[in-house]
């Protein structure tokens, strides 16, 4: 693993987590070490996993531009829930730009 780049390590970690077929997948900045194209591919994979396999995917991010893909958005500030919104029509990752 030490010979892999940060982005490669991140992709391997996500692949290992998905291989376990979890009911809940917690992703802290899943695109943080990735380029734009690979980041979109990973987000698409996570969205498809959620929709097709019924896995609950929690994405923690500072990138508010990706919130349209979420079913629910929870904003936390200083450890306190600041707001919570439900999104009845989540956008496809393909339509999101940042």
Features from the language model and the residues they span:
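ABC family nucleotide-binding domain
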Residues: 1-69
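Glycine-rich, phosphate-binding/catalytic loops in enzymes
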Residues: 44, 77, 91
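Conserved catalytic segment of ABC-fold P-loop ATPases
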Residues: 69-75
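Conserved beta-strand-loop-alpha-helix hinge in the C-terminal portion
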Residues: 80-98
């Amino acid at each position: 693993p030490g010979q892999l780049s940060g982005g490669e390590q991140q992709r391997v970690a996500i692949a290992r987590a998905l291989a376990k077929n979890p009911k809940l997948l917690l992703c802290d900045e899943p695109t943080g070490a990735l380029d734009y194209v690979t980041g979109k591919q990973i987000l698409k994979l996570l969205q498809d996993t959620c929709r097709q396999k019924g896995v609950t995917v929690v994405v923690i991010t500072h990138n508010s531009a990706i919130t349209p893909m979420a079913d629910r958005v929870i904003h936390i500030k200083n450890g306190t829930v600041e707001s919570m919104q439900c999104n009845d029509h989540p956008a496809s990752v393909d339509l999101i730009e940042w």
